[in-house]
Amino acid sequence: MKKPLRWLAALTALLLPLSAFAQQQGLTIDIVGGSASATPITVVPMPYQGSGTAPQTDVSAVVSADLDRSGQFRTLPAAQIVEKPTRGTEVQFQTWRTLKQNYIVVGRVMDAGEGAYRVEYELFDVAKGERLLGLAMTARANAMRDVSHQMADAIYEKVTGVRGAFWTRIAYVTASGSGGSMRYALMVADSDGYNPQTIVRSAEPLLSPNWSPDGKKLAYVSFERGNSSIYLQDIASGARELVSSFRGINGAPSFSPDGRRLALALSRSGNPEIYVMDLGSKQLTQLTNHFGIDTEPTWAPDGGSIYFTSDRGGRPQIYQVAASGGSANRVTFQGNYNATASVSFDGKKVAVAQGSGNTYRIAMMDRSLGSPSWSTLSPGSLDESPSFAPNASMVLYAAREGGRGVLYAVSADARVRQRLVLADGDVREPAWGPYRTAH
C-alpha cells in the first residue's frame, strides 16, 4: 500500500492511532555507528577538586558524547585512558601519540562560591604539543550540562573551523493513548534529549513546531478549536497568540530569518497555497496560486525566497519562490517524491524526505560545488521531517520503528546516528532550534 503524502496528511490531521504511551519522561539516547576516519580525541575525566559537594553532571562525559555524535570525532574509551592529567603541565604527549590521538582535552572542576562551580579546561594538539584552547567557565549546578555543551562547541569549532551546535535545543511532539483518548504534548529539550520541558498539552493533534530565530518562541499547529489553527507561544512565559484560524487548512508555519514574518500554508481560497504574514500588522501576502497543492514553506537563509512542497508537476517536489511572490522554480529532480525541505544556514544544502516505492528516507542535496549531488542520510523505510542543526553538521528527523515514533539525529556525512526515543512513548515532528546566547 502506498504511503499517504506525509505533508498533506499532517495538514488534514489524518494521524494514525498510537499505542498507549507516557509523555512525561525524557528521551533515551543511543549512539549508532561510527567512523574509522573520524578524528581521534581524548577527553580526560575532569575531577571535582573542591571541598563541598561535587556536581551531578559528569562534564567530560557530556563533552565526549557531544563530540562522538557529531561524526567528526572518535573519543578514546574511558578504559583506555591510561593517564589522567588535569592540567596541561601534566600531559605526557608521547603517551597520547602512542595511542594515536590527535587531540587531548584536560580539565578540572572547582568551587566558585555561592553554590557555583568553575570548570577550567585546555585543548592540546598532541602531535605539536601545542595548546589550542585554555578557558574557564562558571555556572551553578543546574547549568553544568549547558557549560559542558558550550565546551564541546568551543572544541568543535577550534578543530573544525565550524561553529559547534551542541548547546542548542530541539522541539518535538509526543503522543499517548489511543482512539478518542489521545493526548499530545509539544516538548522542548536539549539537543541531546536531556532536560525535557512541556510547552503545550492538548487533547487534539499538535503539528509542525517551528522556532523563531531568537529561540524564544515556537509557532505550531493545533486542532483544539476543531479546525487547524496556528499559534505563537513564548517558551519562557507560556504566553501564546492565535495568528491564523481561517476556514480550511492553517498549516506549516515557518519564521522568516528576521523573525518579523511567518510563511504558512492556507486553503482559505479553496486550495492550499503559500502565504506570508507580517507578524506586526497580521497582513497576508499570497505567494502562490496554482491548482496543485502547495505546502510546507521554509525560508532561504537570506530571507529572499521560500522553498515549499508542491504536487503541481504530478508528484510532490520542492519548489522555490521569491518572498515577494512570482513564478516558482522546481528545485528537486532526483526521485519521484521529495517533500518537507530543510535548508542549511548557507543555503547550499537541502534535506528532504525522499520516497521510492514504499520506502521513505532522508536525503540531502548538496549544491556546494555547483551542480547538485545527492546522498542518503537514513536507512529506514518510513523516515520524514528532516531539520538541520544551525551549523548544518547534523540533521534531526522522525522515523517509525516497531509501530512507534522515534527521532534520529544523523551527522551530515551519515557517519553517526543518535536515536532519541521515549522509554514508553511515541515522538515525532522534530525541529532543531537556533544557536543560543549566553546571558
UniProtKB/Swiss-Prot annotation:
Cell location: Periplasm
Entry protein name: Tol-Pal system protein TolB
BP terms from Gene Ontology: cell division; protein import
Function field: Part of the Tol-Pal system, which plays a role in outer membrane invagination during cell division and is important for maintaining outer membrane integrity.
Binding partners and assembly: The Tol-Pal system is composed of five core proteins: the inner membrane proteins TolA, TolQ and TolR, the periplasmic protein TolB and the outer membrane protein Pal. They form a network linking the inner and outer membranes and the peptidoglycan layer.
GO cellular component, one term: periplasmic space
One Pfam family cited in the UniProt record for this chain: TolB_N
Family (UniProt): Belongs to the TolB family.
Keyword terms, alphabetized: Cell cycle, Cell division, Periplasm, Signal
Domain of life assignment: Bacteria
InterPro entries: 6-blade_b-propeller_TolB-like, PD40, Tol-Pal_TolB, TolB_N
Major place of residence: periplasm
Keyword Lyase in annotation: no
Keyword check for Membrane: no
N-terminal signal peptide: 1-22
Record SUPFAM superfamilies: TolB, N-terminal domain (SSF52964), Tricorn protease N-terminal domain (SSF69304)
